[in-house]
Amino acid sequence: MGVLRVGLCPGLTEEMIQLLRSHRIKTVVDLVSADLEEVAQKCGLSYKALVALRRVLLAQFSAFPVNGADLYEELKTSTAILSTGIGSLDKLLDAGLYTGEVTEIVGGPGSGKTQVCLCMAANVAHGLQQNVLYVDSNGGLTASRLLQLLQAKTQDEEEQAEALRRIQVVHAFDIFQMLDVLQELRGTVAQQVTGSSGTVKVVVVDSVTAVVSPLLGGQQREGLALMMQLARELKTLARDLGMAVVVTNHITRDRDSGRLKPALGRSWSFVPSTRILLDTIEGAGASGGRRMACLAKSSRQPTGFQEMVDIGTWGTSEQSATLQGDQT
């Protein structure tokens, strides 16, 4: 709990704070656990005022139990499911991206992580008409590719332009720039500072590995702390502000078993609620469009399910024909 200060709660004045501090009562914990009769006598304060102050502080800082029914009702009213625009991926995600959760896309170089993120952003901006914050940390985002994906969804140039306006792109090439971006979003989300009306619904970070991995290993002890600070910011955006957060991560090889695994270690593995592993299909090669998506972690579905996605057709006439066929 915090330090006693003016404005912390009604009735807590500067004079009262100074008197309490003179008797070693500096924090909320000190005050609520103290003998108020003794404090009133020593500090010359009103006992009734101290009792009222403690009640306010307990109501403001204490944790109160919530029954399961109320929690479920709150979940139903606060959770939205946002389609990615990729049918096979939506199957793995149990219908799409969930607000309040962090979803991680894992894969090696050329596996299609950025293409998946761009497709998600395009679908949320155009199909769902929601705002997206796209944080690019590796220079993989190109406006022309984003426009190409939108052109496959609609031939109306005005609709394309409107969708592009809903996607806010920020470049952050180190951990400090990324933290600044996320903290600024958290601090201003209530003011609707995005380019279009409404707040940001989806945050895409492509990728966390690019800004975190240089800080890990060796004598850089603060790297783990910075990584967990980034994790807290992402979870705060998801859980407290009702956003769907998508991050990309690389893969690395385990030194003992030699198996491939997501980068950033065990501490990071607890951050995403859902993890999708992207891999090239054997024989297709990195230049081919087909990828195998595997559900590696989920709080809703059994893991191990696989779906094939063909990123080579996204933004092409073939995809446009498929979309038109789905609409008829």
Curated annotation (Swiss-Prot):
<keyword id="KW-0238">DNA-binding</keyword>
<dbReference type="InterPro" id="IPR020588">
    <property type="entry name" value="RecA_ATP-bd"/>
</dbReference>
<dbReference type="GO" id="GO:0140664">
    <property type="term" value="F:ATP-dependent DNA damage sensor activity"/>
</dbReference>
<keyword id="KW-0779">Telomere</keyword>
<feature type="region of interest" description="preferentially binds ssDNA">
    <location>
        <begin position="1"/>
        <end position="83"/>
    </location>
</feature>
<dbReference type="GO" id="GO:0007131">
    <property type="term" value="P:reciprocal meiotic recombination"/>
</dbReference>
<comment type="subunit">
    <text>Part of the BCDX2 complex consisting of RAD51B, RAD51C, RAD51D and XRCC2; the complex has a ring-like structure arranged into a flat disc around a central channel. In the absence of DNA, the BCDX2 subcomplex XRCC2:RAD51D formed a multimeric ring structure; in the presence of single-stranded DNA it formed a filamentous structure with the ssDNA. Interacts with SWSAP1 and ZSWIM7; involved in homologous recombination repair. Interacts with BLM; required for stimulation of BLM activity by the BCDX2 subcomplex XRCC2:RAD51D.</text>
</comment>
<dbReference type="GO" id="GO:0051726">
    <property type="term" value="P:regulation of cell cycle"/>
</dbReference>
<dbReference type="InterPro" id="IPR013632">
    <property type="entry name" value="DNA_recomb/repair_Rad51_C"/>
</dbReference>
<dbReference type="GO" id="GO:0005524">
    <property type="term" value="F:ATP binding"/>
</dbReference>
<keyword id="KW-0963">Cytoplasm</keyword>
<dbReference type="GO" id="GO:0005815">
    <property type="term" value="C:microtubule organizing center"/>
</dbReference>
<dbReference type="GO" id="GO:0043015">
    <property type="term" value="F:gamma-tubulin binding"/>
</dbReference>
<dbReference type="GO" id="GO:0003697">
    <property type="term" value="F:single-stranded DNA binding"/>
</dbReference>
<dbReference type="GO" id="GO:0003677">
    <property type="term" value="F:DNA binding"/>
</dbReference>
<dbReference type="GO" id="GO:0005813">
    <property type="term" value="C:centrosome"/>
</dbReference>
<keyword id="KW-0158">Chromosome</keyword>
<comment type="similarity">
    <text>Belongs to the RecA family. RAD51 subfamily.</text>
</comment>
<dbReference type="GO" id="GO:0005657">
    <property type="term" value="C:replication fork"/>
</dbReference>
<dbReference type="GO" id="GO:0005737">
    <property type="term" value="C:cytoplasm"/>
</dbReference>
<dbReference type="GO" id="GO:0042148">
    <property type="term" value="P:DNA strand invasion"/>
</dbReference>
<dbReference type="InterPro" id="IPR003593">
    <property type="entry name" value="AAA+_ATPase"/>
</dbReference>
<dbReference type="InterPro" id="IPR016467">
    <property type="entry name" value="DNA_recomb/repair_RecA-like"/>
</dbReference>
<keyword id="KW-0233">DNA recombination</keyword>
<comment type="function">
    <text>Involved in the homologous recombination repair (HRR) pathway of double-stranded DNA breaks arising during DNA replication or induced by DNA-damaging agents. Bind to single-stranded DNA (ssDNA) and has DNA-dependent ATPase activity. Part of the RAD51 paralog protein complex BCDX2 which acts in the BRCA1-BRCA2-dependent HR pathway. Upon DNA damage, BCDX2 acts downstream of BRCA2 recruitment and upstream of RAD51 recruitment. BCDX2 binds predominantly to the intersection of the four duplex arms of the Holliday junction and to junction of replication forks.</text>
</comment>
<keyword id="KW-0539">Nucleus</keyword>
<feature type="binding site">
    <location>
        <begin position="107"/>
        <end position="114"/>
    </location>
    <ligand>
        <name>ATP</name>
    </ligand>
</feature>
<dbReference type="GO" id="GO:0036297">
    <property type="term" value="P:interstrand cross-link repair"/>
</dbReference>
<dbReference type="GO" id="GO:0006281">
    <property type="term" value="P:DNA repair"/>
</dbReference>
<dbReference type="InterPro" id="IPR027417">
    <property type="entry name" value="P-loop_NTPase"/>
</dbReference>
<dbReference type="GO" id="GO:0016887">
    <property type="term" value="F:ATP hydrolysis activity"/>
</dbReference>
<keyword id="KW-0206">Cytoskeleton</keyword>
<dbReference type="GO" id="GO:0005634">
    <property type="term" value="C:nucleus"/>
</dbReference>
<keyword id="KW-0547">Nucleotide-binding</keyword>
<protein>
    <recommendedName>
        <fullName>DNA repair protein RAD51 homolog 4</fullName>
    </recommendedName>
</protein>
<dbReference type="InterPro" id="IPR047323">
    <property type="entry name" value="Rad51D_C"/>
</dbReference>
<keyword id="KW-0227">DNA damage</keyword>
<dbReference type="GO" id="GO:0033063">
    <property type="term" value="C:Rad51B-Rad51C-Rad51D-XRCC2 complex"/>
</dbReference>
<dbReference type="GO" id="GO:0005654">
    <property type="term" value="C:nucleoplasm"/>
</dbReference>
<dbReference type="GO" id="GO:0008094">
    <property type="term" value="F:ATP-dependent activity, acting on DNA"/>
</dbReference>
<dbReference type="Pfam" id="PF21794">
    <property type="entry name" value="RAD51D_N"/>
</dbReference>
<dbReference type="GO" id="GO:0000724">
    <property type="term" value="P:double-strand break repair via homologous recombination"/>
</dbReference>
